Amino acid sequence: MRLMMTGVFALAWVAVAAPARADEYALDDSHTSVSFKIQHLGLSWVHGRFDDVSGTFGIDKDASKSSFSLTIKTKSIDTNNKKRDDHLSSGDFFNIAQYPTITFKSTAVKAVDGGYEVKGDLTMHGETKSVSFTLKGGKEAEFPKGVHRTGFSTDLTLKRSEFGMDKLANAIGDEVQISISFEGVKK
């Protein structure tokens, strides 16, 4: 009996002492969007998006233990113009044959009012750069019943030349404005 009670207390101690794990989420592709805009000749904006985006994230009470990762299939680029999309897919720009994905993996997460300050490694066109941005959101909802989800959004600006995409520099702007919005479904 004494051995059994010792075992029960040991199990209870392990349960209490075990660190809580982050809530893990998978991106809901029907509620995830990665869009961009870039200037053309300094006159107007070309708008586009990537249609194939996946990823996961973990939210921990200790924000420094939270994480975010994202993968974009470059062949899914869509600017509503097939000829332009084919050119953007070529070696002049994304070179989708050689670089089929754009990836982001967080390296540091900090809680801020209304969301998280996220720093991480963005790999695009064979170049990896450290980027930082603020994710806004984090409200939770249950929809449909029993499916727990949360969502975030951010806007950031990148220079395409920093990722080796400097073709047509006189015609197309260097700065690309990016908007990311996503919902995750709790695993």
For each feature predicted by the language model, list its residue ranges.
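Bacterial N-terminal signal peptides
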Residues: T6-A15
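Low-complexity, acidic/polar, glycine-enriched regions of mature
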Residues: A20-K187
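N-terminal secretory signal peptides that target proteins for export/translocation
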Residues: M1-R2
